[in-house]
């Protein structure tokens, strides 16, 4: 597939993964389709929904560039499918329920040359509080960590990096940090931006049961890090993991 650019502005592919969540998909699609950036491709990957989700996706017509509706092996398998279907130079995952922070978010990121020379460009994420207000959570500086230092909803990845380093679907809860650590270790450059990119749906997969997510993070560190980094990182995971087990979370 040929990577496309319009003038000096890169084409950006937004991938939305969904299954049996028509209301959440509607919220996300409206956010994506309202972006002011001129060259956006929209890819929806529906995991063979059994309700009205695929009907709604089809109702969007040619505003959706690629619609895949078939069974998958979980969210990260579906996200890999979205990357393979994309034709943009950059890819961002805005899954069902997530939205861009503002209509001009993509324009803010790619309206300058701040992304040049980097493989991952990321910003902050906002979460809704009990009153429904968006509270911005700052991303961390790039480093080899025991957990994500940004939310993947707030990150733009070069598509060629995602193709070379896809999500490992063996990690059903923590394939995102597994991927980020592999990118970091192969020397991919990360660029942190001082702006909110996404509003995060806190009902996502890694928020369902925290102990399961922490256990998978532990396995990622054990798999990818050497002894020194294990000694540094594992205590930061085992303490909250044991606390979650005691609390039944």
Q: What residue ranges belong to the model's regions?
A:
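Catalytic core of nucleotide-sugar-dependent glycosyltransferases
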Residues: 208-231
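Amphipathic, soluble alpha/beta structural segments
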Residues: 204-213, 243-247
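Residues that form generic nucleotide/phosphate-binding pockets
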Residues: 112, 220, 245
């Amino acid at each position: 597939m040929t990577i496309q650019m319009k003038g000096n502005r890169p084409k950006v592919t937004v991938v939305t993964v969904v299954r049996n969540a028509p209301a959440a998909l509607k919220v996300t699609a409206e956010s994506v389709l309202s972006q002011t950036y001129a060259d956006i491709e929209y890819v929806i990957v529906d995991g063979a929904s059994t309700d009205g989700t695929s009907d709604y996706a089809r109702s969007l017509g040619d505003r959706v560039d690629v619609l895949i509706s078939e069974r998958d092996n979980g969210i990260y398998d579906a996200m890999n499918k979205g990357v393979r279907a994309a034709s943009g130079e950059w890819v961002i995952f805005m899954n069902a329920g997530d939205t861009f922070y503002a209509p001009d978010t993509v324009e803010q990121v790619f309206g300058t040359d701040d992304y040049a020379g980097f493989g991952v460009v990321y910003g902050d994420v906002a979460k809704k509080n009990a009153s429904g207000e968006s509270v911005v959570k700052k991303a961390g500086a790039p480093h080899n960590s025991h957990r994500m230092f940004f939310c993947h909803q707030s990150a733009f990845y070069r598509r060629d990096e995602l193709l070379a380093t896809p999500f490992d679907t063996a990690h059903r809860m923590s394939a995102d940090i597994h991927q980020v650590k592999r990118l970091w270790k192969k020397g991919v450059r990360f660029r942190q931006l001082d702006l909110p990119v996404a509003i995060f749906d806190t009902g996502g997969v890694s928020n369902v049961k925290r102990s399961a997510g922490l256990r998978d993070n532990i396995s990622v560190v054990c798999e990818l890090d050497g002894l020194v980094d294990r000694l540094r990182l594992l205590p930061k995971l085992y303490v909250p993991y044991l606390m979650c087990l005691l609390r039944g979370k």
